[in-house]
């Protein structure tokens, strides 16, 4: 069977792998306002400015109503901002004609929370669907489908229907389908929310493989900080339509600046006592301090000095985490004994790190 110039052969598709560069995404002063029939207005996005570099994995995190999903709809052209610019590889897509948007969407893969598979199609049939829409030659389609199923670890599941697959396998089919047309941008909207922890870990491992081997830019929308911790290079924290905090995963996890970021980080790290634990700790003798641990915090030297002066240091909570090849942690300690030595311990560490006393 012959192939037209617009229909890549399996060899041509293989030659395109892996992608050498993902899509660059830029939000410039993006605002989105929704109006209902009674003229009431809701600001879903409020002057969002954010850049996602090619090949980067960014986690966009926030509670329900923060504006995360609205961002996704803008990226794939399903909605338009009220004001601002949205650039994909330097091209502003705001106001772009639908014919051009359709072409743009072919370069964007999408995976969903509820998988969105066709129940009447096999796993292979689901992966093949976007290739049919793209009018790819049948032989090339079949080869590409098998290639993608093998890539996601389902090479022997092509003939299975969705009802015969586990949740994790369904999401793998969804990922294979999203990758079928060789996109350079992948949008993952709460892609692991419906999965158990072990399956979530497996799917995140697969997404890391996608980014590592194919060079695809990945935008992960989630309300789970553990997902961001596992996969992202950068994180943007959203609240009430605004990006309230942005930085590397290490920066945000080790030193969250906003209250909402602090709450999210606490759910993933659990290295500070919660209110109930604090109340229990406060029921015992001594002063309680939570201390940020870094290479320059001076914690161990201060502990040794306190012990020499008759203060006893007892570690009651905490942990150390390594992210992006850097370590950080928090330690909660109870000090008893010489009151002057305890105060010196506290004052010394205020000069070298962040130390907070836990009180009622």
From Swiss-Prot:
One of its GO terms (molecular function) is ATP binding. Disulfide bonds: none annotated. SUPFAM superfamilies: ACT-like, P-loop containing nucleoside triphosphate hydrolases. One of its GO terms (cellular component) is plasma membrane. Belongs to the ABC transporter superfamily. Methionine importer (TC 3.A.1.24) family. Part of the ABC transporter complex MetNIQ involved in methionine import. Responsible for energy coupling to the transport system. Its EC number is 7.4.2.11. Pfam families: ABC_tran (PF00005), NIL (PF09383). ATP binds at residues 62-69. This is Methionine import ATP-binding protein MetN.
């Amino acid at each position: 069977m012959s192939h037209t110039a617009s229909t890549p052969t399996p060899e041509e598709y293989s030659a395109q792998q892996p992608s050498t560069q993902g899509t660059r995404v830029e939000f410039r002063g993006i605002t989105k306002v929704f109006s209902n029939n009674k003229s009431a207005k809701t600001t879903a996005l409020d002057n969002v400015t954010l850049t996602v570099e090619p090949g980067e994995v960014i986690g966009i995190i926030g509670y329900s109503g923060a504006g995360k999903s609205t961002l996704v709809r803008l990226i794939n052209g399903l909605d338009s901002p009220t004001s601002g610019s949205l650039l994909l590889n330097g091209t502003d897509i705001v106001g772009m004609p639908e014919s051009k948007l359709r072409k743009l969407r072919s370069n964007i893969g999408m995976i969903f929370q509820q998988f969105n598979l066709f129940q009447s199609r096999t796993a292979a049939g689901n992966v093949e669907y976007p290739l049919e829409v793209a009018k790819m030659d049948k032989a090339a389609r079949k080869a590409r489908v098998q290639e993608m199923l093998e890539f996601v670890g389902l090479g022997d599941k092509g003939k299975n229907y969705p009802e015969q697959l586990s949740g994790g396998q369904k999401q793998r089919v969804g990922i294979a389908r999203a990758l079928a047309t060789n996109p350079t941008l992948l949008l993952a909207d709460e892609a692991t929310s419906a999965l158990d922890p072990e399956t979530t870990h497996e799917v995140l491992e697969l997404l890391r493989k996608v980014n590592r081997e194919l060079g695809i830019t990945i935008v992960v929308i989630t309300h789970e900080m553990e997902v961001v911790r596992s996969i992202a290079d950068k994180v943007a924290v959203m609240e009430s339509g605004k990006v309230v905090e942005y930085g590397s995963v290490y920066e945000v996890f080790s030193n969250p600046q906003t209250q909402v970021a602090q709450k999210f980080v606490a759910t993933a790290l659990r290295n500070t006592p919660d209110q109930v634990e604090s109340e229990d700790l406060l029921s015992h003798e001594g002063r309680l301090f939570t201390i940020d641990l870094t290479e320059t915090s001076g914690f161990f030297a201060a502990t040794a000095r306190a012990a020499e002066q008759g203060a006893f240091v007892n570690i009651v909570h905490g942990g150390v985490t390594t992210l992006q090849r850097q370590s950080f942690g928090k330690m909660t300690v109870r000090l008893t004994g010489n009151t002057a030595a305890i105060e010196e311990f506290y004052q010394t560490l205020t000069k070298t790190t962040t130390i907070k006393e836990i009180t009622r």
